[in-house]
Structures are given as C-alpha cells and as structure tokens.
C-alpha cells in the first residue's frame, strides 16, 4: 500500500500516533513525505530514522539542500531518485514516478517566509525554490505522459488553492506557487478529463477540499484506481 503524510521536521520522537503507525508498515508498503522531512537537516539525523517501510521524500523549504544535492542518484520507479540512506529516497522535482502502476508527479519546494531570520547554507537554502530548468523538465515529463497523472505531490499548492483554503491575512508571493498554478493549468488544458489528486503539506494544517488534501501529521492511504480516479482514506490512529 502507498501511504502519504505531511511535514515531519524530524520530530517523530515528540509524537505518539504517527510513529506507532509507521512501525506497523513493512517493506511491501511505501511511505511518501510531502517535504520538510527534517531527517536530512543534519547528516547524523538520518541515523535516527529507522523504519522498515521504504520512505520517499518530496523537497520542502526547511530541508538541507547541500545534503540533498550531494546524495547519489539511482534509477527507481521509472525515474531518478536521490539515495539519502538505504530505504530513504528523494523524489526529484519535475519527475514522474510509477508507484504500483500509478503515475505520481512531483513538484517540491516552497518559499521560507522566515528566511530573513535564517543563515544561508546553514539554516536556509535558496534551492528551496524550483528553478526554470525544474519547471521545464516538469513540462517535458508531463507532455511525455500525455498530461495523464494520478497524483500531483508537492510541498505547497497553487496560489489559487492557498487563497481559497487558508485565507491568510498577509500576501507573500511564492514563485513555487506560481509555477504550480501554471502546471495545473497546462495539465487541465491538455487533458480536460484529468482526474488527479493533489496532496501537499507545508501549511501545518489538515484540510481536504475537492481533489486537494493538505496534510500535516496525518497519514492517508491511497486506494485502488477506478474509472472515477483515486480515493484516499485518512488513517485513524491515537493522537497525542
């Protein structure tokens, strides 16, 4: 089974429900983290993450891109992944992966609104914003896939979805959200019958609206694909 969760920030030791659930997963499952994994913040942190389940992480904004970019790459799931440690892999922005027959498109990254209080290449990395090359590669891969995907996984969402779901009192322009807006436009323009689900984290909130799901400490299970598309099911576990 495929399970997806939101930001971890290397804080599973301060949680109860999610770590216990992750311990129940096996090598036959897959876990996808929607950015801000946290266990790549320092090299030694990866030694603290020891679950059997193969774990795949989307780029966030509070991630150490020096470690991410220095990790070796290999072919897996039909595209290129970064190998962070045995059993923990980076899903690269702009790529499409095959998870159990599902086409999973990934576009990570987001703007750190607190970057003015952070130190470049110590606690903040400019690579948090996808590049024009990332965007062009995304378009190229989507075109190769005939604009047909099952899951769109990101760290943040489009400007329109952000405004509709969260009603923030401040306005900050995030280039990542603009790129996601355009990518969604392109997908729906070229494939008007697109039935993908869009899952993201970043906002430390839990909300499901139409085809969009914002996750934080929640875990969802991806169901079987039908003519109506995919369904997700929220995993119920003790909170605390």
Features from the language model and the residues they span:
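Beta-strand-turn-beta hairpins that frame and shape the catalytic cleft
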Residues: 1-3, 95-106, 148-151, 209-214, ...
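Active-site-proximal loop/helix segment associated with metal-binding centers of metalloenzymes
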Residues: 100-178
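N-terminal active-site segment of His-dependent metallophosphoesterases
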Residues: 1-54, 64-65, 73-75, 147-148, ...
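Short amphipathic alpha-helices and their capping/turn segments at secondary-structure boundaries
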Residues: 23-26, 80-101, 134-149
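Active-site environment of divalent metal-dependent phosphoester hydrolases
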Residues: 9-16, 37-43, 61-68, 96-97, ...
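A basic- and aromatic-enriched beta-loop-alpha substructure that forms the phosphate/nucleotide-
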Residues: 46-123
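Active-site neighborhood of phospho(di)ester-bond hydrolases with catalytic His/Asp-centered motifs
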Residues: 4-7, 31-36, 55-62, 91-92, ...
